[in-house]
Amino acid sequence: QLPNVVSREEELALKAIQTTYQVDDRYNAVTHSFLQSCVEIFRDAPVTLLREHYRCHPKIIEFCNQRFYNGELIAMTTDDGEKDVLQVIRTVPGNHARGHFNKREIDVITQEVLPECAESESIGIITPYRAQAEAINQAVGKDIASTVHKYQGRECDTIIMSMVDNYPTEFSDDANLLNVAISRA
């Protein structure tokens, strides 16, 4: 579960409340998801990892399993010999991002990636940033892109991930965000 996305203004307001009323940091909605707060507050409560995974192709969940779960997950899906279940497509070198928007990535998605996925039953595009999702939806003429946070709990046969940033940032390089993003397919 990902923590909330809050504006700088909301963060400052929450910080003021936390300071004024001496609220324990475990309740910090900026840095903690509800689940994280519960785990920290109820330290003696039993925690259960749901190990059986039914969503992703085994090759995709194996990446997440090794990177984020210390090999504890059990893939319950089958590998039917599909090729290229996890691909990385890089745009041309250069500084194409402008804030939370990357036109070059949108061009590559619409002109190169989506035509390759035409036979897929369901396609979703995820990105860390709302501005990028809105621009992608406008470019493709339908509502198929959303933020990683809003995609939690959803899945598609094909997921395209638009990272936007030219270089990793504290936000886009977050391990929880990457885990949720990768495991949507």
Where are these regions (language model features)?
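Conserved helicase motor core of SF1/SF2 NTP-dependent helicases
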Residues: 1-185
